[in-house]
Amino acid sequence: LKEEFPLNKLVLFDINKERQEPIGKYGDIMFSERYPELEFAYTTDPKTAYEGMDFIFMQMRAGGLQMRREDEHIPLSMGLIGQETCGAGGMAYGLRSCVDMIEAIHQIRTYSPNAWILNYSNPAAIVAEALRREFPDDKRILNICDQPENVVRSTSRLLGCSWEDLDPV
């Protein structure tokens, strides 16, 4: 993996120190044993996390798991779709996510104005549109969603063929 995907530095950032600490400690052990030349750190400080970075991979859950439960259960209690990326819950989650993502991108651009940002936060379409509107000239923000691949794979199963045989374009 080192030859195929060489890294010099990896920093894990989280706003919740208690949630982050076990992952960070595991990373300390794993990388010191398997990738000792990698500079590894974990932090709750945005400057430490973002300063001088070339690539930033982001995934956040605005409101945490408690709000995910609310986003799913409140619509279900009213006979509506209870899902985190669509329906009433998806819209609530999206609105929360947009605020936090915009703030995070502003922080990143303060410390790493030229970093590539790969965003994998849900709901992908809502967040991507908010970021496009807030940062219309920033061509280094890439929003990623795995749903198109899932649609192709599900369709291939329905058609009884390999997903590689389908051309979605």
Annotate each language-model stretch with its function.
Residues 8-9, 39, 116, 140:
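Residues at the starts of beta-strands that form the adenosine-phosphate
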Residues 50, 54-60:
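N-terminal Rossmann-like NAD(P) cofactor-binding module of classical short-chain dehydrogenase/reductase
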Residues 62-135:
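Rossmann-fold NAD(P)-binding glycine/threonine-rich loop
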Residues 39-52:
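Short acidic low-complexity segments
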Residues 2-35:
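Glycine-rich phosphate-binding loop and adjoining beta1-alpha1-beta2 segment
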Residues 39, 137-140, 144-169:
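Substrate/ligand-engaging "lid" and interaction regions
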Residues 2-3, 28-33, 110, 129-141, ...:
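Short, surface-exposed basic-aromatic patches at helix termini and helix-loop junctions that form
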